[in-house]
Amino acid sequence: RVLALSAGDEVELFLNGQSLGKKPVGEELALTAVFQVLYQPGELKAVSYKGGAIQGECTLRTAGPVSALRVEASRLALSAGEQDLCILTADLVDEQGVMNLWEVKPVTVRVEGAGTLLGFGSGNPSCSGSYQDLCWDTFDGRVQAVVRAGKEPGPLTVTFSAPGCSDAQVTLLVNPSDFR
């Protein structure tokens, strides 16, 4: 069962390029179209129409085996002085960059330079580790680290590693603080 939410007039659902038909949406239907779909790996795309014109679309793809870590940082520059924080998210992705939510891998974090690791974890509600641990199993394909800028300016490099993946690294710039 696939639920497609849209503020348009109707939604068309495609499975691996084949249309599964259009269904109406609207306030009387709680802006939701319901499709009965047999699972197939590949691509599922919903296209929203309003007045016959495409209003928007959303695509989901089946993830393949994990081949890499993808890291995103909440910011790339911090101010020295031990007040600024950055949240780094490391996701397990396949060769096409699709996040794999199902595979579990232990991920290790290493922090070098002008800052420190404040905490590291996966968000798994049933885990028993400490946020000070340097290795966590992914949960829903993800781990997160929080780093804090140090007292002095300079580069702050955060490296994530997992079995079967190349290391993923982000270098943040810790700038001199404006406060004295």
Segment roles from a protein language model:
Residues G52-G64, S166-N175:
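Edge beta-strands of extracellular beta-sandwich domains
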Residues G17-E27, L118-C135:
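Solvent-exposed serine/threonine-rich low-complexity stretches and specific carbohydrate-binding patches
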Residues A63-G81:
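Low-complexity, acidic Ser/Thr/Pro/Gly-rich terminal tails and inter-domain linkers that flank the onset
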Residues Y39-E43, Q83-L85, P153-P155:
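Extracellular Ig-like/FN3 beta-sandwich strand-entry sites
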Residues A33-Y39, Q132-K151:
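Short, hydrophobic beta-strand segments
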Residues V2-L5, V47-S48, Q83-L101, V107, ...:
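Beta-strand-rich structural segments
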Residues K23, S67-V71, V109-S126, D178-R180:
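Short aromatic-acidic-glycine turn motif
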Residues R1-G56, V93-D94:
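Long hydrophobic segments that form regular secondary structure
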